[in-house]
Amino acid sequence: MAIVSSITNHSSLPNDKGEERLVGPSLLKEELKLSQQDSLRPKSFDDFVGQSELKKVLEISVKASLKRGEALDHLMLYGPPGLGKTTMALVIAEELGVKARVTSAPALERPRDIVGLLINIQPRELIFVDEIHRLNRISQELLYPAMEDRRLDLTVGKGTSSRMRSIEIPPFTLVGATTKPAALSSPMRDRFGITQRLDFYNYLDLENIIKRSAKLINLVISEEASQQLAKRCRGTPRIANRLIRRVRDYAEVYSHSKKIDVEVVNDALDLHRVDQRGLDATDRSYIGLLVNQYQGGPVGLETLAAGLGEDSTTLETVVEPYLMQIGFLHRTSRGRVVTPAAKKHYLLTSPNNIDK
């Protein structure tokens, strides 16, 4: 399977010091340099760990389309970042035996970008559009007839002399990935024949991902070490693979070994200030402010943002979701409130009750 990529715009959200978060779900700058042929990516449904229900649905659809000799129905994959939407799209292309054209919505701002993508498409090829919810209205409307009727409707000329020209295109599969499916227009959503959600991974699946990745980069990791890593990666494979690379770096420099035990994992991640629940310094500062200055809340978002020197949108979309996921934070009509579990964890992991 060939992969053609035109992704030019991904962003990871840094903290207020301009540093990228090791446990953030978005791609880091170093990861942007990795191609879609990253050695840790699964190449088949069998290699893809987790998401068992999703895999079953897609395996059936892929096998049925191959049996009929037809293009797979258009597919929308949605869910939090870092769970494998891009990887799943590439696996599908591999299973179909077709080329994958990989792009993102910011690279498709102008009509000619859409036309350029579709005009040379080959029968049954797969187009993957990341962040598809960011497509503007004109780009979405250009895709409507392409997805439904396999044609491009182009306006030729200007003013009174303008006319509509339709160009037929071969059957193809559009795979759209999004963290915000509701941000897509209703007509756009309706044109996807298959819509599937990716969920956060359980500890067992994450352990298996970590073991698989360790083997691929020639590491020997103990059972206890893989369990410890799984607890710290926030249910997200992207973070799991990122952490195992950092642990590898630490082991090679300090242990001069490719054997990873639980002590190496703890030492490496303590150095990066990632605790046993996957919280980093930003998370602990957030909880610490609530616990130490506001007795656990409730506190308004803007007040917290001012106290931390962070943007309120960053807190709401990057910091808070994981804290809510693990039961450390409640959003109420009166403001943010930390739970007893959050207070207990904070007091245990911050000796002076303040994360400096």
Curated annotation (Swiss-Prot):
Polar residues biased stretches: 1-14
The protein's name is: Holliday junction branch migration complex subunit RuvB
Compartments it resides in: Cytoplasm
What is one term from the GO cellular component aspect held by the record? Holliday junction resolvase complex
**Where is region (Disordered) located?**
1-20
Q: Where does ATP bind?
A: 40-41, 82, 85-87, 191, 201, 238
What's the EC number here? 3.6.4.-
What gene is behind this protein?
ruvB
Starting at the broadest rank, the lineage of the source organism is:
Bacteria, Bacillati, Cyanobacteriota, Cyanophyceae, Synechococcales
Q: What's a Pfam family in this record?
A: RuvB_N
According to its UniProt record, which reaction does this protein catalyse?
ATP + H2O = ADP + phosphate + H(+)
Family, per the entry?
Answer: Belongs to the RuvB family.
Listed under subunit, the entry gives: Homohexamer. Forms an RuvA(8)-RuvB(12)-Holliday junction (HJ) complex. HJ DNA is sandwiched between 2 RuvA tetramers; dsDNA enters through RuvA and exits via RuvB. An RuvB hexamer assembles on each DNA strand where it exits the tetramer. Each RuvB hexamer is contacted by two RuvA subunits (via domain III) on 2 adjacent RuvB subunits; this complex drives branch migration. In the full resolvosome a probable DNA-RuvA(4)-RuvB(12)-RuvC(2) complex forms which resolves the HJ.
Residues recorded as binding Mg(2+), renumbered to this chain, are 86
Give the Gene Ontology MF terms in alphabetical order: ATP binding; ATP hydrolysis activity; four-way junction DNA binding; four-way junction helicase activity
The principal localisation class reads: cytoplasm
Originating organism: Prochlorococcus marinus (strain NATL2A)
The record's section on SUPFAM superfamilies has: P-loop containing nucleoside triphosphate hydrolases, Winged helix' DNA-binding domain
Q: Give the domain of life.
A: Bacteria
- Enumerate the UniProt keywords alphabetically: ATP-binding, Cytoplasm, DNA damage, DNA recombination, DNA repair, DNA-binding, Hydrolase, Nucleotide-binding
